[in-house]
Structure formats: C-alpha cells, structure tokens
C-alpha cells in the first residue's frame, strides 16, 4: 500500500464544496471518481481544508492510499483527462505513512479577491467579489491587525460551525491593493466555518467608511456573531496553501502567482 499526496486546483463555482454531498456534485466526488479509474480500485481522499460551495483553490492538498503502481504522469495527466476542466491535479508525491493532509498541516493560507470599481467586470463573474464603492485599503489593513494572534473568534464563526471551540491563531493578515483589485491574505493554524468570509465582510464595512477602524477590535472582544459584518460572498475566496513541517518537502503556491490584471 502506497500513500500519495496530490496538489489540486479548482474553480468551485459548479460544486457544492469539497466534501461529498448526497444531492449535488462536489470536488471530492469528481477527484475520487477520476483517481479510482486510473488506479482501477476505489480511492478515498482526505484533504487539508474543506471548502464551501463556490469557493476556489489553487493549493489544495489531499492524500490517498492505493495498491496501484502508476508513474507520476498517470496520476497527473491521466487523472486530469478524467476530470472536468475546472478541476486539475498539479503534482503528486509519495509520502511516509505518518502523513495526513489535514492533521499534519500546521497552517493554512487563504486569499480573498475583491474587484473594486463602479462597474463589474464582464469576464470575472464567480471568480471575484465585486464592490462598487471605493475602499480605503489602509484602514482595512489597520483594522485587520487587531485580529492577529491567538483569540476567540466567536464573532467571526458561522452559526452552524461544529468546531469544539473558537480559539484560532491568526499568524498573518494583510490587506493590499493592485489596481482595481483588493487582496485580503490571511494565514492561521486553522479556520472556523465561514471565518475568512466573515472577517472580510467586516473589513469591507471599515473600507467603505461605514465603521471605524476600532470597531473590529471591539467585535473580537464581544464574541458575538450578530454584531459583526455580513458574510462576504464565496466567489472571491481562494484556498492558497496548506503548510506542513519542512521534513515533508511539499510544494507551496507562491501568492504572487495569483495576481490579476485590470
């Protein structure tokens, strides 16, 4: 039995998230079907971070066990020929038996992409979130810094979040602009359900000048989801990386690879 890790990118628009669902198509279902065809045996996947309906990924990582012996080309090009055009396997690597895509990860990175101009783009539908009002990115970034470190993120978790507690360690959070695009880049040890989208929805209120910079710090202390901003749309969210101990020697996506032109 061989343990393999794979890198995956996908546009999540057509899928009800990563995880298996009874009544709609998922990224996991498509990948397991394609991998099982190449392996000629049933394949089950475990991933680093389960994404929601409409959320994309450029650096998702998953692992599976197989009795099949195939060259890398079969696990990449062969599997990709069995996948729809909006899902791709980008690399494959044999892993030691103690590796687990989810539990071995020490951090995850997300990027949220906002298209900020009065008129929406005709070609970026479902790939970005449109904001027609001018955004003050400096104020958004300043407010975001109050979320760094280990905190109780109850104000930014979904009502149906099943996590046993709301403590998370946000290690990096930056808001920046490139032309008409505003990027929110965040790294944490783990994330609560809708945590990134709820943070972005809150920062948008600061960027529109509807709320002061200090509001975000106050929300964190209140630990009350009803007091924070609305959940930002799924379309702008990208799972960028899962980070692992260097001993596993896994590829990483460089954030600069996800740049946009306008």
Swiss-Prot record:
Enzyme Commission designation: 5.4.99.12
InterPro entries: PsdUridine_synth_cat_dom_sf, PsdUridine_synth_TruA, PsdUridine_synth_TruA_a/b_dom, PsdUridine_synth_TruA_C, TruA/RsuA/RluB/E/F_N
Keywords: Isomerase, tRNA processing
Entry's Gene Ontology molecular function annotations: RNA binding; tRNA pseudouridine(38-40) synthase activity
EC primary class: isomerase
HAMAP family: TruA
Name of this chain's protein: tRNA pseudouridine synthase A
Name of the coding gene: truA
């Amino acid at each position: 039995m061989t343990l393999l890790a794979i890198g995956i990118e996908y546009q999540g628009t057509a899928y009800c998230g990563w995880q298996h669902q009874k009544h709609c198509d998922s990224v996991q279902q498509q990948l397991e079907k394609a991998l099982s065809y190449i392996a000629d045996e049933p394949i089950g996947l475990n991933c680093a971070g389960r994404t929601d309906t409409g959320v994309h990924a450029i650096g998702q990582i998953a692992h599976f066990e197989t009795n099949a012996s195939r060259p890398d080309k079969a696990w990449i090009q062969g599997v990709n020929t069995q996948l729809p055009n909006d899902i791709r396997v980008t690399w494959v690597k044999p892993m030691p038996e103690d590796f687990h895509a989810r539990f071995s990860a020490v951090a995850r990175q997300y990027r949220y992409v906002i298209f900020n101009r009065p008129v929406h783009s005709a070609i970026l539908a479902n790939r970005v979130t449109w904001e027609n009002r001018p955004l003050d990115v400096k104020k958004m970034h300043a407010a975001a810094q109050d979320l760094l470190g280990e905190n109780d993120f109850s104000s930014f978790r979904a009502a149906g979040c099943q996590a046993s507690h709301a403590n998370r360690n946000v290690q990096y959070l930056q808001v920046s602009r490139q032309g008409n695009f505003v990027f929110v880049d965040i790294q944490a040890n783990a994330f609560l359900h809708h945590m990134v989208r709820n943070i972005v929805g809150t920062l948008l209120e600061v960027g529109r000048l509807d709320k002061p910079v200090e509001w975000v710090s106050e929300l964190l202390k209140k630990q009350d989801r009803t007091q924070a901003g609305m959940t930002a749309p799924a379309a702008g969210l990208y799972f960028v990386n899962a980070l692992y101990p260097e001993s596993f020697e896994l590829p990483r996506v460089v954030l600069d690879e996800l740049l946009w032109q306008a």
